[in-house]
């Protein structure tokens, strides 16, 4: 299945919440009705959503937030299930430690899609080595940086400026002047978006 390249706001409306696919710092809530489904008048239904439907919707939402395709997502879940601890939390930690997400969390990209592009275009290094695989897992202590040739890109400078104003996660330490950051540790569940109900995804795959 190909990656979705259509209107980002449409996906947020479909999930009924801002997935921050267009900007991490500016909410879509003021621009469109997130409680209305896509369509000329917003599709409505009087039917109650089944448990399976609710679980599936939550999985779709998380896939879209992190820009992960179905096959990748299944692999992440399988790995999360193999690890000790809470499977749902393990899943979110695996997604959060993807290189494209870490680049986004450090403020080098205004969206995960933009961060993914920076990685694919070889504008990012990990521990001094050029990295171009968005799904690369970042480990505690890894240093992620913008390559010298990309430091003057307006989109990176602007994204970093906005991130500094909005604040960054406690599990990354960023030196904006050097355009680099350190992945201090895996984020705790409380440090990851609270509007995700990962237990629904665990229930879905446990069927």
UniProtKB/Swiss-Prot annotation:
Gene3D superfamilies: Ribosomal Protein S4 Delta 41, Chain A, domain 1, RNA-binding S4 domain. Residues 42-53 have a biased composition (Polar residues). The keyword ATP-binding does not apply. One of its GO terms (cellular component) is small ribosomal subunit. GO terms for molecular function: rRNA binding; structural constituent of ribosome. Residues 97-160 form the S4 RNA-binding domain. It holds the Pfam family Ribosomal_S4. The keyword Nucleotide-binding does not apply. Keywords: Ribonucleoprotein, Ribosomal protein, RNA-binding, rRNA-binding. Belongs to the universal ribosomal protein uS4 family. HAMAP family: Ribosomal_uS4_B (MF_01306_B). One of the primary rRNA binding proteins, it binds directly to 16S rRNA where it nucleates assembly of the body of the 30S subunit. With S5 and S12 plays an important role in translational accuracy. This is Small ribosomal subunit protein uS4. The lineage of its organism: Bacteria, Pseudomonadati, Pseudomonadota, Betaproteobacteria, Burkholderiales.
